[in-house]
Amino acid sequence: MVRGRTELKRIENPTSRQVTFSKRRNGLLKKAFELSVLCDAEVALIVFSPRGRLYEFASAPSLQKTIDRYKAYTKDHVNNKTIQQDIQQVKDDTLGLAKKLEALDESRRKILGENLEGFSIEELRGLEMKLEKSLHKIRLKKTELLEQQIAKLKEKERTLLKDNENLRGKHRNLEAAALVANHMTTTTAPAAWPRDVPMTSSTAGAADAMDVETDLYIGLPGTERSSNRSETG
């Protein structure tokens, strides 16, 4: 009769779990000892109980010696393994880049129309469609750049027109200020007889008319003025 396979799981009962731990621990230590003796192997075993108690076995003079040997071994082999993996990764990357460069060079030759002897009609049509799509994208980009340049030129034109209008306004203000200053100068200056006009009888009268003497009289109207006239007469 074949025994069924027992499912391994944690023993819930603490007493049963402790009894099982003691039995299995002793059996494991015995197996480790037998392996070291029968096969002349260096064996080290470390076990912590559920309560944290340490159990250990070492076929070497000390457990630490076996642990140090393990550390040195893993350090050397892990480093060598890592180096080998890095070298292989570099080789794979180099091979991948070489394939990509070859594909790009092939595409470049197709675009330039080189080495087309072995192409079929379908391949040439496909290449033509790709070129047309590329040209369409190039034209769109070119149109976009031209529109941007035109927009910048229009903005610059608006700025220049605005600056020109401001300068015209300042010029008009300066002309108006000059006219006002000139008018004030001509109206407030005293009248003078022109030097280049000859003095004649008519012009002398005009000159006398320009020289007017004013007197101040105090008294009743006509009194002082008449007496002065009689004296002068």
UniProtKB/Swiss-Prot annotation:
Keyword Lipoprotein: no
Gene3D superfamilies reported for this sequence: Transcription factor, MADS-box
Matching CDD domains: MADS_MEF2_like
GO-annotated cellular components: nucleus
Biological process (GO), any one: positive regulation of transcription by RNA polymerase II
SMART domains the record matches: MADS
Residue ranges of domain MADS-box in the record: 1-61
GO molecular function terms noted in the UniProt entry: DNA-binding transcription factor activity, RNA polymerase II-specific; protein dimerization activity; RNA polymerase II cis-regulatory region sequence-specific DNA binding
Keywords: DNA-binding, Nucleus, Transcription, Transcription regulation
Subcellular location: Nucleus
Domain K-box: 87-177
Principal place of residence: nucleus
Domain of life the protein comes from: Eukaryota
Claim: Transcription is one of the keywords in the record: yes
A Pfam family annotated for this UniProt entry: K-box
Function field: Probable transcription factor.
The protein's name: MADS-box transcription factor 56
Lineage of origin: Eukaryota, Viridiplantae, Streptophyta, Embryophyta, Tracheophyta
